[in-house]
A protein has these predicted regions:
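Short, small/polar-rich motifs associated with maturation and membrane association
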Residues: 1-468, 482, 839, 867-869, ...
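Extracellular/periplasmic, surface-exposed regions of secreted and cell-surface proteins
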Residues: 231, 282, 288, 416, ...
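Acidic surface patches and DE-rich sequence motifs
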Residues: 134, 147, 157, 519-520, ...
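A short, hydrophobic/aromatic-rich structural module that often spans a beta strand
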Residues: 157-160, 313, 358-365, 372-373, ...
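Conserved small-residue
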Residues: 342-398, 498-499, 747-748, 757-758, ...
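Short beta-strand element of the conserved SAM-dependent methyltransferase core
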Residues: 106, 266-268, 329, 632, ...
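A subset of solvent-exposed loop/turn segments in beta-rich extracellular surface proteins, enriched
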Residues: 370-372, 382-400, 516-529, 534, ...
Length: 940
């Protein structure tokens, strides 16, 4: 702690000496500005100077408001700032002083009259001292403390301390770049302490993009971002569920609530291809620049920010891997300063929001008899299944063993369950090493009521996840930064041998009178009265299984600055090793149930099978992914021109024993990016990915995937009218191409599949009836297609970012369109004369699909005194259409799926059921809806 604190002070003291040693007036003379303003307030001129330069103007509004409201004309071209200031203040009672270019650029003070100077001499001066700190109790070295309306001021030293000579009644203001200024009136006290809060300005947010980061106001692609604060607002079980409804353009569908299986399926701007396998539709997931398969293993407390890259401009650098969009996760890292320790835990209650209310046994018996009586085929010789005596026994509950009445939902399920999330992390660092270390535990329990039966082992559904992460940033030398990351996620999922779906299906289909439940720790059935021989608790007797997962990630990155060759040039590289292993243990029980019978006054439990021992079955698997990259970056600033460039080579290998032919899966690619920024006003970007694949024949393996984008910040234009309503306006557009090389798990699509040994008589020779003999041999399965090439998608995007009333209201809107051609697919039709099935035909490029829509976000927020509020809403609409596919010939045109949405439900829309014999006799057939109101019933 002592060394880190000293280094922190040393860094800030160096910054202070740097600030004090500058030549501010010379800088003001060197900085030029071009303005063309007519009849505008002086305040508007100052705002334009702020936007066109690095200056920040500070003044006390109450003293200078009338002077700053005076209107002036300013027409200058590449003129020094000091000349402009002299011009606009020449007819006012305002003077100025340029302090420095980093902290406070301009001070505006009232000109002192001789009378006021004389009064100042006569006033009683007092010596005051104080400190300026941030919210983390760190000194703000170089912070300005001044007396408003005068030229009296001071700067905070290495300890954040200052000293001034002031008069009672003066107003002190402490300010620091990036922080809200704070004011206090001088009374009799001589000691002051200022604690400044950081300015919340979303336009200055840093957005993580592919292999880099940019200021949000200069981004030209379609990118949305959330922070760890957003992810932790609700106690979700995983990140995919936490993202639901939080990001425009991201569609989330949760299909299960089972512990460990309740993650959501994520799609960025819908589905752009009709390839049915998930891999062809899933977005690419990157964590700290390294590809991962599953984001749900990550502890949300480890996440610093999460970006969604949606258009071609944002995803082109990922080539074929980013065809369906990219999710970039940036984990937390250490910061300079003393150790910061954080501990958090939360407990959430889970329950079923709705369960059916079943009939009791009495109602069921009555309804069953009535339903059978109305059965047309049985009504002539119908004998009620349930006698009146049995129905009365159900009603009174006089014999609960043989005439039971059990609500199986209440009997087998708990009212609620719990899940917990606990995290402990520590971060900090010195000038040499910064660190972030995190430990997390997540537990999630199921809803089965395990108290009704004890087989000697636990069959409750339960999930446990343990997370560990350590991120280290090491300044090896002045120019070399090395980052070492280690993360490990371990999960354990336990459940009965019967799936949750089977258990719930049993609850839904078992009537209340089927069985008496569990008696004396025996799962009981009844078959000799009216029981069905079923008991929904019988899955509890079949054993249990556990699945263990271990995900280990090791990665190292370096950045080497080469300013000695060219300022702004740096080399970068990364190497990662990812190991994923699973082990499944299954313990099978005999599944003994007992049929209950009565012999006089004695109850007899007849076992369904003989008792036995548990049997064990285990499986395990492992895969390894190795990734490496090397590249160079450049950032150059030339006046108002900023140019950045990136060239990067990457490759990866994936090892998995289940891969076809036991050959590792390889990947290679080149990445290029160039951005241009003129005065934060005109923005341009070119991205390109060059990728190779194993699936296509030589000569077709590599493909170029370029993307282009432009942006225009209108509010940075000198002629744009400045007002309090519209504070920021940017329009942007992008166009690009992305590709896909995958179709299911098939590999080497240009080659035929391996010949297989038939193992039976498949080849016959000779004449039938005499020498006709069958022989075993090899046969070809799936054929290859050497003409196969890339599936490509052309993507368009136009959007706008708008801020109103000093950024209190924000609006982002995007319209997108994707046209995908040469879709990789298997044929659905094949002429019978070919003699092979469609499943053995090779893959083809035959299919077209269009996907379009819009998304956006509206945010409202402000700070009122010590209170702040923030409201955000987003919207997404995506609509796809299959333009061409290989489809079986239909008898009617309306039966074709081509021209409809992918995955659209198909069939007639029912209009209810018949409720009386009159309706049955009158119609004679089901009733359907005329969806098109054209007096024709068609599927919809």
């Amino acid at each position: 702690y002592g060394r880190g604190h000293f280094c922190n002070k040393l860094k800030r003291s160096i910054l202070l000496l740097f600030l004090l040693g500058m030549f501010p007036y010379a800088w003001g003379q060197q900085t030029n500005v071009s303005l063309n303003l007519r009849n505008v307030p002086i305040k508007s001129v100052l705002s334009q100077i702020e936007k066109s330069t690095n200056y920040y103007v500070f003044f006390y509004t109450d003293n200078l408001n009338s002077e700053l409201s005076k209107r002036v004309n300013v027409t200058v071209n590449n003129t020094p700032v000091v000349t402009v200031l002299n011009q606009i203040f020449s007819t006012t009672n305002i003077s100025y002083e340029i302090k420095n270019k980093r902290q406070v650029s301009l001070f505006l003070v009232e000109k002192s009259s001789p009378k006021s100077k004389a009064q100042a001499v006569k006033s009683n001066k007092i010596q005051i001292t104080g400190t300026v700190f941030d919210a983390n109790n760190e000194p703000l070295i170089g912070a300005s403390v001044r007396v408003l309306g005068t030229t009296i001021g001071s700067m905070a030293d290495i300890n954040g301390a200052f000293k001034l000579e002031v008069s009672p009644g003066d107003v002190l203001e402490a300010s620091y770049i990036g922080y809200n200024p704070q004011q206090v009136k001088v009374g009799s006290q001589t000691r002051f302490q200022f604690v400044l809060e950081e300015v919340a300005n979303t336009l200055d947010d840093i957005v993580v993009v592919g292999y880099s980061s940019q200021k949000k106001e200069t981004v030209t692609g379609s990118i949305s971002m959330v922070t760890t604060k957003d992810l932790l607002q609700s106690p979700q079980a995983n990140i995919s569920n936490a993202l639901g409804g939080r990001i425009p353009g991201l569609l989330s569908v949760q299909r299960s609530g089972e512990p460990g299986q309740d993650m959501s399926t994520l799609r960025i701007r819908g589905v752009g291809t009709f390839a049915s396998d998930a891999e062809s539709q899933n977005p690419l997931i990157m964590v700290d620049g390294i590809e991962v398969n599953n984001l749900n293993d990550i502890d949300p407390n480890e996440v610093e920010s999460l970006s969604i890259l949606k258009d071609a401009s944002a995803t082109a650098v990922y080539g074929v891997r980013g065809a369906n969009g990219v999710i970039l996760i940036t984990t937390k890292r250490g910061e300079l300063g003393k150790p910061k320790i954080s501990f958090s835990t939360n407990v959430a209650i889970t329950n079923f929001p709705f369960l059916p209310e079943p009939m009791n046994s009495y109602e069921y018996a009555r309804a069953y008899n009535e339903a059978q009586a109305y059965d047309y085929y049985s009504q002539l010789s119908y004998i009620p299944r349930y006698s009146e005596e049995a129905i009365e026994a159900y009603r009174t509950g006089s014999d609960p063993l043989f005439y039971p009445d059990i609500n199986w939902y209440d009997y087998m399920l708990k009212d609620f369950s719990t899940q917990t999330q606990t995290n402990f992390n520590v971060s900090g660092g010195t000038e040499r090493v910064k660190y972030f270390v995190s430990l997390g535990v997540f537990t999630q329990n199921g809803m089965l009521d395990t108290g009704i039966y004890d087989p000697g082992y636990s069959y409750q559904i339960a999930f446990r996840r343990y997370n560990m992460r350590s991120n280290f940033d090491i300044n090896v030398t002045k120019n070399l930064l090395l980052s070492l990351d280690i993360s490990n996620q371990m999960g354990n999922l336990q459940n009965p041998n019967w799936s949750t779906g089977q258990i719930m299906e049993s609850l839904n289909s078992t009537p209340s009178n089927a069985a008496p439940g569990v008696i004396d720790n025996k799962v009981v059935t009844i078959t000799d009265v009216f029981g069905s021989g079923r008991n929904p608790a019988s899955p509890y007797t079949r054993g249990w299984k556990s699945k263990y997962e271990n995900n280990l990630n090791l990665s190292g990155r370096f950045t080497y600055k080469m300013d000695y060759l060219l300022k702004g040039l740096s080399l970068r590289g990364a190497l990662s090793y990812k190991s994923y292993s699973t082990e499944t243990k299954t313990y099978n029980d005999r599944g003994i149930t007992y049929d209950l019978r009565r012999a006089g006054d004695e109850l007899i439990f007849v076992p369904s099978t003989d008792p036995g021992k548990l049997t064990y079955q285990g499986t395990n698997s492992r895969n390894i992914r190795i990734y490496s990259e090397i590249g160079a970056e450049y950032t150059g600033k030339f006046g108002e021109h900023t140019v950045t460039g990136l060239v990067l080579y990457n490759q990866g290998k994936y090892y998995n024993p289940t891969l076809k032919y036991n050959i590792p899966n390889g990947y290679q690619g080149l990445v290029g990016r160039v951005t241009y920024n003129y005065g934060n006003r005109y923005l341009a970007e070119v991205n390109v990915g060059y990728n190779g694949t194993e699936n296509f024949a030589p000569g077709k393996r590599f493909g170029w995937f370029p993307a282009y984008s432009l942006g225009w910040v209108l509010t940075e234009e000198p002629y744009f009218p400045r007002n309090e309503v519209l504070s920021f306006l940017k329009i942007r557009g992008s166009y690009g191409t992305v590709g896909n090389d995958k179709i299911g798990g098939d590999r080497f699509l240009y080659l035929p599949s391996v010949y297989t040994y038939t193992g039976s008589n498949s080849y016959y020779f000779g004449e039938v009836g005499s020498s006709y003999v069958g022989y075993v041999g090899s046969n070809e399965s799936k054929a290859g297609n050497p003409d196969l090439t890339w599936e490509k998608a052309i993507k368009w995007n136009v959007g706008a970012d708008v801020k109103f009333w000093g950024d209190r209201i924000g609006l982002t809107f995007d319209y997108f369109m994707e046209h995908r051609d040469n879709i990789l697919c298997n044929r659905n039709t094949v002429p019978t004369i070919i003699g092979i099935s469609a499943s053995n035909l090779p893959a083809y490029n035959m299919g077209r699909m269009r996907n379009s829509g819009w998304d956006g976000e509206i945010s409202v927020g402000d700070r009122i005194g010590d209170w702040s509020y923030f409201v955000k809403a987003n919207f997404t609409y995506a609509h796809n259409k299959i333009l061409e596919q290989d489809e079986v010939i239909r008898n009617e045109d309306y039966l074709y799926r081509t021209g409809l949405r992918y995955g659209q439900f198909f069939g007639y829309v029912a209009d209810g059921i018949f409720n009386s014999w009159e309706e049955v006799n009158a119609a004679g057939r089901p009733e359907y809806v005329m969806a098109n109101n054209n007096n024709k019933i068609q599927p919809g």
